[in-house]
Curated annotation (Swiss-Prot):
This is 7-cyano-7-deazaguanine synthase. Binds 1 zinc ion per subunit. InterPro entries: QueC, Rossmann-like_a/b/a_fold. PANTHER family: 7-CYANO-7-DEAZAGUANINE SYNTHASE (PTHR42914:SF1). It catalyses: 7-carboxy-7-deazaguanine + NH4(+) + ATP = 7-cyano-7-deazaguanine + ADP + phosphate + H2O + H(+). Pfam families: QueC. Zn(2+) binds at residues 185, 193, 196, 199. Its cofactor is Zn(2+).
C-alpha cells in the first residue's frame, strides 16, 4: 500500500494539526489547498509558508469560479460575517453550499493520481451543528462512494471528527506545534477580529487549555 496521502490543508488550526499528525505517522504527505473565493484567503499564505518550511509538496488550486454557481455565503459573498459563538444559528450564513463534497472529490481525484489510498481533512465535533458536510454520516456516505468511484479505492480520514477544537489543540500542543503559523479568522483583515465564530472558538480552545494564543487580534 502506498504511503502517499493527501491532506486538505486550509491553513487553519485543525488541518494544521492533521497535517502534522499524518507526518508523524510516517505518511508521505501531499498538501492540497483551495482558493474558492473565500474572503479569508490569507489562510492560504499561512498554508504555503508551513509547507515550505516543512518541505511538504503543496498545491493551491483556484476554483473561485464556482462562486457563480454557489454564492450566498458570508465567506464568499458580500454578506457580513456574523459575530458570536460558533454554534449559534447565525453562523449558518458561513456555510458554502456543498463545499466539502466538492473539495473532497477533487482531493480524491488527486489521491488516485498519486496512487494514494487516503485523504485527510480536519472535520471536528464543533462543526457538526452548523456544517452538514463535517458530520460523521456525511463522511461515511462519502467513503461508500469513494470505494467504488475509481479503480483505486480511497478512504477519507477524519482523525478528529469526534473531538472538539479544544481537544485538537491539546493534541497539537502536546506535539509542540506553533499555532502562530495558522490563521482562523473568517475576516481577511491584517489581524484576526476576535469576534467572529471561528475566532471565538479558537480563543475558547486556548482558554480551555490554559494557553496563550500567539496570533495577534484587533
Amino acid at each position: 500500500m502506498s504511503e502517499n496521502v493527501v491532506v486538505i490543508y486550509s491553513g487553519g488550526m485543525d488541518s494544521f494539526t492533521v497535517l502534522h499528525k499524518a507526518l508523524r505517522a510516517g505518511k508521505k504527505v501531499h498538501a492540497l489547498s483551495f482558493d474558492y473565493g473565500q474572503r479569508h484567503k490569507k489562510e492560504l499564505d499561512y498554508a504555503a509558508a508551513v509547507c515550505t518550511s516543512l518541505g511538504v509538496p503543496h498545491k493551491i488550486v483556484d476554483i473561485s469560479a464556482i462562486n457563480t454557481l454557489i454564492g450566498g455565503s458570508a465567506l464568499t459573498s458580500d454578506i457580513d460575517v456574523p459575530e458570536g459563538h460558533y454554534e449559534e444559528p447565525s453562523m449558518k450564513q458561513t456555510v458554502v453550499p456543498n463545499r466539502n463534497m466538492i473539495l473532497l472529490s477533487l482531493a480524491v481525484g488527486y489521491a488516485v493520481s498519486l496512487d494514494a489510498n487516503e485523504v485527510y481533512y480536519g472535520a471536528h465535533s464543533g462543526d457538526h451543528a452548523i456544517y452538514p458536510d463535517c458530520r460523521p454520516e456525511f463522511v461515511h456516505k462519502m467513503n461508500d462512494v469513494c470505494g467504488i468511484a475509481n479503480y483505486t479505492p480511497v478512504t477519507i480520514m477524519t482523525p478528529y471528527i469526534k473531538d472538539s477544537k479544544t481537544a485538537i489543540l491539546t493534541d497539537g500542543l502536546s506535539m509542540g506545534l506553533d499555532y502562530g503559523q495558522t490563521w482562523t479568522c473568517y475576516n481577511g483583515r491584517e489581524k484576526a477580529c476576535g469576534k467572529c465564530g471561528a475566532c471565538e472558538e479558537r480563543l475558547e480552545a486556548f482558554k480551555d487549555n490554559g494557553a496563550t494564543d500567539p496570533l495577534e487580534y484587533e
